[in-house]
Amino acid sequence: ELAIMKGRVDGLEARVNGIEAGSFSETTSMSGKVEMQIGAGSNGAAIVGDNNNEEQTTFAYHYEVDLNTSFTGDDKLNIEFAAGNAAGTNTVQGITGFGESQDALTIEDVNYTFPLGRWDVSVGDSMDLSKNFPNACALGTIVDAMDDCGAKNAVDAGGDVSVSLGTEFADGWEFGFGFSGDSGTSGIATKESTDGLGAALGYSNDTYGFTFGYALADGGATANSDTTYYGATAYYTPEGMGTLS
């Protein structure tokens, strides 16, 4: 009887393991951050638009909350909520990276990342085409022109409806490339759409690292409006010191 019972227990355990292996299991975590900026303008020419005020002191903030869900343990569904009071027009290079206005809570990013062989693949809306690019820069700021060590447009290219792939193909070496299509009515990869594509190659170890990036921003139907970006980032860590980038 003990042998029969043991056989039944073993059979039940095998069935439970089979159910767990094919079951839907999710884990969701939440993270967030708040960025703030205070600044004053001189009585010189306006940086953006026409403004006759001689002096301007402004305060801007931006906060975001990320929900990350994994269904298999190897994938990730990311949904990002964001809000802020900075004017949406003040996002030109050299000012700030804030894009929200009127304190409106918006869904800023939705993307899904999963493994495909040796590649990490990400697809999403309002997602950077450079999501899976290597990047050797340790500097991050809220000012666009200073972000990613001044190489933002190349190694941290933005995007709309995007796909991004990245892989580590050798010890310390990584490669990534991506494509972004226009989510508007112009279609994806058409003559009228404002698409983008890019690639980056990087190497890193415990002491130093570097990345070379390339991106092309298609100007759409506007003649001679395509823009090409090249960028490089690097870091070096002397023994016993923090990272210099």
Where are the model-predicted features located?
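Long, hydrophobic, well-ordered secondary-structure blocks that form the structural core
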Residues: 138-141
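Beta-barrel outer-membrane channel/assembly domains of diderm bacteria
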Residues: 1-130, 143, 147-184, 192-208, ...
